[in-house]
A protein has these predicted regions:
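N-terminal helix-rich structural modules
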Residues: 21-155
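Bacterial Sec-dependent N-terminal signal peptides
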Residues: 1-21
Length: 155
């Protein structure tokens, strides 16, 4: 039992060290939060993408499990705010893949692109999420939305 506990503590500690060293976690701490390309390694992408998928899945689940009536804030805005980490990592990965590709990035793309497609499909085809969005959309004339909110709802 003691050995198991020590192993678990070591794994958690190593995970925290790895997370602390991955520039995708947290703020970049660069002028204007520009991407610190000099600190990003190929091995940073996959764990950050997997964590981003996990976080967005939890965010989507929170939206669809919300017991309150669907409204602009708890559905549309919440959906818009979901997936920030994933968006951040995928944007950098996509740009690097097209601008400075190499065999390692292409191999990683072969591995993660199906995961990203599946994740996207799971969101866009989620019937419970669609029902909440539709409920808000059907009220759009009575919601007194700003132009920006209307555009967000339409898209």
């Amino acid at each position: 039992m003691e050995r198991l506990l020590i192993t678990l503590i070591l794994v958690c500690t190593m995970n925290n060290i790895t997370n602390a060293q991955n520039p995708f976690y947290g703020q970049y701490h660069t002028p204007h939060e520009t991407v610190p390309f000099d600190r990003i390694e190929t091995e940073h992408y996959e764990p950050a993408i997997l964590e981003g998928i996990k976080l967005q899945n939890a965010e989507i689940e929170a939206i669809i499990q919300n017991p309150e009536k669907a409204d602009f804030t708890n559905t549309i805005e919440a959906f818009e705010e979901s997936g920030k980490l994933l968006d951040k990592v995928v944007a950098v990965f996509g740009n690097m893949l097209s601008a400075e590709t190499n065999d390692d990035l292409q191999e990683l793309a072969q591995k993660i692109m199906p995961l990203l497609s599946e994740h996207s499909n799971n969101i866009t085809l989620n019937e419970k999420l669609f029902a909440r969005v539709k409920e808000v959309y059907n009220q759009k004339e009575t919601l007194q939305l700003t132009q920006e909110q209307k555009q967000l709802l339409e898209n």
